[in-house]
Design a protein with these regions (language model features):
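Core catalytic lobe of class I
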Residues: 1-279, 285, 291
Length: 291
C-alpha cells in the first residue's frame, strides 16, 4: 500500500517513533524515481521514459539543463506530502529518524521543517566497507589521444561513501520535554552506563541474506530503536518498509510496528519474512501474521 493512502487510516497523535529508510530520489531503481524529467540526456529513468535503452544512472551524458535542475525540487515536493501526514499522526516530541542520501539530505530536512518539524541532528551510520565508483579520467583522455602524467590516478565520480546520514527530527512540543517523557516516554534518548551515546553509529554491513538492494543492517535498526525507545508499548512507523527489516527489529526489541510498502514484490518478501520470524519464535500471541 502507498503510505500516503495508508497513513490516512492512522489516528491523530498515535505514533510514538518514525524510523524509515526512505527512497533517496537518486534514480537507483524504478521505485526510486521521484521526478518527471523526460530529458533523454539524463541517465536516470523517468516514468515517462520506459525505453529499455534508457540507462539507470543519475547524471546526464552531456551536461545539465533546466529540466534536470527540477529533479531535487520535485523530490522535495514529494517528501512534503508524507511529512504533512507524519505531523498529524505523531505525538509531541516524537523522534523522526530518516535515512537519506547525502545529495538530497537538505531537501528532506527542508520538507520536514516546512511541515512543522524541528531538525535535531544528523546522525551518521559509519560503515565498515563500501562499494566505490570513480572513473580514471585517463580512460577517456586516451581515447581522445590525450596523454599527460598530471592526470594519472585523477578520477571522476564520488569519494568512497563510507557513511550514510540519518536525519533526527522531532515534532514540536507545547510544554516541556520532561512532560513529554512522563506522558509518552519520548523526547530523549537512552544512554548506557552513564555515557551519552555518540551521534555516530558504527555498524558493519554484515547482511548474509539480502532481501532488498538498499537494505540496512538489522543490528543498526535495533540500535536506533534502543536509543530512542524505552517503552515496549511504543508504536514505530516505517512508511517505506521494503523487505521488512524495521518490523523484524521491532519484534526483536519487543516493540509494536506499522509498515507500508507500495512495491508488490517487496511487500511479498516482507510478509513472508515477518511471518516466518513470528512463527519461528512462537510469537503469534503478540504479533499478528500478515495476510
Amino acid at each position: 500500500m502507498d503510505c500516503l493512502e495508508g497513513m490516512k487510516y492512522i489516528d491523530d497523535k498515535s505514533i510514538d517513533i518514525v524510523l524509515s529508510d526512505i527512497p533517496y530520489g537518486i534514480n537507483y531503481d524504478d521505485w526510486d524515481v521521484l521526478h518527471t524529467n523526460t530529458n533523454s540526456a539524463l541517465m536516470g529513468q523517468s516514468p515517462a521514459m520506459k525505453q529499455t535503452t534508457f540507462k539507470k544512472r543519475s547524471k546526464p551524458i552531456n551536461g545539465w539543463n533546466k529540466a534536470d535542475k527540477r529533479i531535487s525540487y520535485e523530490y522535495y515536493s514529494w517528501c512534503r506530502q508524507w511529512c504533512k501526514e507524519l505531523f498529524r499522526i505523531t505525538k509531541e516530541a516524537s523522534p523522526i529518524l530518516l535515512f537519506s542520501s547525502k545529495r538530497y539530505l537538505h531537501r528532506v530536512c527542508c520538507a520536514l521543517e516546512d511541515e512543522g518539524f524541528l531538525i535535531r541532528d544528523i546522525l551518521i551510520w559509519q560503515k565498515d566497507r563500501c562499494h566505490a565508483k570513480a572513473q580514471r579520467i585517463n580512460n577517456v583522455l586516451h581515447k581522445r589521444k590525450i596523454y599527460d602524467d598530471i592526470y594519472n590516478d585523477y578520477r571522476i565520480g564520488n569519494l568512497a561513501p563510507m557513511y550514510e546520514p540519518i536525519i533526527w527530527a522531532m515534532k514540536p512540543y507545547s510544554h516541556t520535554l520532561t512532560d513529554c517523557v512522563l506522558e509518552n516516554k519520548i523526547g530523549g534518548f537512552y544512554g548506557q552506563n552513564g555515557i551519552i551515546p555518540s551521534n555516530i553509529f558504527n555498524c558493519p554491513i554484515n547482511i548474509k541474506n539480502k532481501y532488498h538492494p538498499t537494505e540496512k543492517p538489522l543490528q543498526l535498526i535495533k540500535d536506533l530503536i534502543k536509543t530512542f525507545s524505552i517503552d515496549n508499548n511504543h508504536i514505530i512507523l516505517d512508511m517505506f518498509i521494503g523487505s521488512g527489516t524495521t518490523a523484524i527489529a521491532c519484534i526483536n526489541t519487543n516493540r509494536n510496528y506499522i509498515g507500508f510498502e507500495i512495491e508488490k514484490r517487496y511487500f511479498k518478501i516482507a510478509k513472508n519474512r515477518i511471518n516466518k520470524h513470528i512463527l519461528d519464535n512462537n510469537l503469534q500471541d503478540k504479533y499478528s501474521l500478515i495476510v
